[in-house]
Amino acid sequence: MRNYRGGDYNAGYPITELTASQFRTILTPRILASIMQPVPPVNDRPAVRYHDQGVTFNGNLGDFALARDGVDIVRYLCDHDVRVSINTNGSLRPDTYWADLGRLGVEIGFAIDGLADTHHLYRQDTDWHRVIHNAETFISAGGRAVWRFIPFDHNRHQEAECRAMAQRLGFAEFENIWDGRDRGPAFTRDGVFSHHIGDLMPTEAVEPPPWPQLLENHITWYDSGTVQHERDTAELNLRCVHKMNREVYIAADGTVYPCCFLGFYPQTMNHPGNRELRELVQGNNALEVGLEQAMSWFNTVEDTWNRASVREGRTYQCVVSCNRA
C-alpha cells in the first residue's frame, strides 16, 4: 500500500485485494481469449500482435506479492495462454512463492535501485539482499527476470556494476525507468524528514515542511485555480496509452479505468490531479456491472481534451502523462 514519500500511509488507499474468484469473474475465459487476439488490420496495415499483450500487475497502488491469491491468479492466466508480467519490490514471501512463479514461466520486473548501500534510500522498508535472493530463486525455477533501475543522483555511479550483476545472475534484461520519481524529500513513518533524493533541495541544509503540509500545499495549489503545468499546452499531442495499446486498468477493488495513470479511489484519494475525475467516473466497478459496462464512461475523459486548459477542465493526468506537444 502506498504512502506519501515514505511517511504515514495514505488513508485514501483502502486496504483491499481481488480474490482469485473475483478475478475470474472480471476476466472471464472469453475476455482472456480476446486479450491475446492480434489487433485488427487498419486500411492496408496487417493485423498486429504486440509483444506486451497480456496482463500486467504493475503495482500502481500496492505490491503484487501482498496479494494472497496472487499465484492462483497467475496460474489461471497461464492456463488460458495469457502472457503475464509482474512488477514488484520483491522483498516479501518465502522461496517457494518465487519458485512457483518461476515454474509458471512468467516475467517479473524486480525494482532494484542500486546496491545494498543505496537501494533503500528510495525503496524504503525493503531488504536488498532479500530481493536479490528472491530474484535468483525465481530465475533458477525458470522465470524471466528484469532488473528495473531508477537512476537517481545517489545511485548513478553504480549502474554499470548493477548491469554486470544482472547479467551474472541471469536476468534477461536491465531496464532504466524514467518516471519522474527521481527527486524530492523522503520522510519516516512518523512524518519526520529523513533525507532528500535528487537536486531540488537548496544548497544550504534546509529541511522541507512536514509531509502533511507538503500535501496540503499541493491541494491548495490545485484548488486555488493556479494549477499550471508545462505540458498543458494550447494544442495537445496526446499519445494515449489506453487508445494506442488497447489498455485497461483494473484496480484491486474491481473498479476500472482507461489506464493506471487515471486509477484512483474517487471518494477518498488525496491526489489533487485526479479530483476532476470524480465527476466523470460512473458505474465503473466490474464486480457489480461486468467489465464492458464498467468501461462505458471512458469517452468522457477524451471529451475533456477539447477544453482550453487544465484550469478549464482538461483531465490533468492525461496532460501530465501523455501530452507530447
PLM features: what roles do these ranges have?
Residues 56-59:
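Nucleotide-activated donor-dependent transferases that construct or modify glycoconjugates
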Residues 315, 319:
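Residues immediately within or flanking Cys/His clusters that coordinate Zn2+
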Residues 54, 65, 73, 85-87, ...:
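Catalytic phosphate/metal-binding cores of nucleic-acid and nucleotide-processing enzymes, i.e., regions
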Residues 90-91, 115:
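Short beta-strand->alpha-helix junction loop in the catalytic core
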Residues 2-24, 29, 33-34, 38-42, ...:
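Radical SAM enzyme [4Fe-4S]-AdoMet core and its adjacent flexible, acidic
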Residues 69-70, 97:
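Acidic donor-diphosphate engagement hotspot in glycosyltransferases and nucleotidyltransferases
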